[in-house]
Amino acid sequence: MKNGSPAVIWEDRLMFQRLIDDCVGCCELVTPQLLAAPFYRGSFGALIIPTGFANKEYSRVLPALRATKSRIKRFLESGGEILVFGGGGDIPDCYDWLPFSVGYHFEYGPREIVIRKESDTTNLLEGYDLSAFECDGYFTGYQGDPVASTPDGHPILIE
């Protein structure tokens, strides 16, 4: 996280947030209600959106992300960073709140992945068995460069 402390967007604290706290320091929790509040301004430099954010059965995050699309665009344009995990359901347009085009195909299960480009983001994959990496899908139609993909070319990590 280059630009300040991170924030996790979710309904309540997650075990995942504790891991971030342990690795990079204090991690702010931003609830969907807080995110969508018109005058809310966080003091974080990075946003983390966990797996399942688009699945209505588990999360109310996607409507809040869509409601704040223009603020997210300004956040990124001013140097903010964002790490978004899989939508967690068969919702191809679940990334439509991003200021660039990203398509998503839900297909949960382990798969072999190949590092296509060396970058700082490959650190996210260190220590995992790349022959059986758990994914909830892959990207279709995207702007950016694939960092890791399946052997048949389906990107699972883009930057």
Where are the language model's segments positioned?
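Short, solvent-exposed loop/turn segments at secondary-structure junctions
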Residues: R13-M15, F53-A54, G89-I91, D152-H154
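Aromatic-Pro/Gly-enriched surface loop or interdomain linker
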Residues: M1-A46, P50
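Charged, low-complexity, helix/coiled-coil-prone segments
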Residues: V8-C23, L125-Y142
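A glycine-rich, often tryptophan-bearing local segment used as a flexible ligand/cofactor-contacting loop or short
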Residues: A54-F139
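A short acidic, often aromatic-flanked loop/helix-cap motif at beta-alpha or helix-coil junctions
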Residues: L34-Y40, R111-R116, T121-T122, G153-I156
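Surface-exposed charge patches
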Residues: R18, K73, I156
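A glycine-centered loop/beta-turn motif at secondary-structure junctions
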Residues: K2-S5, D22, V30-P32, F44, ...
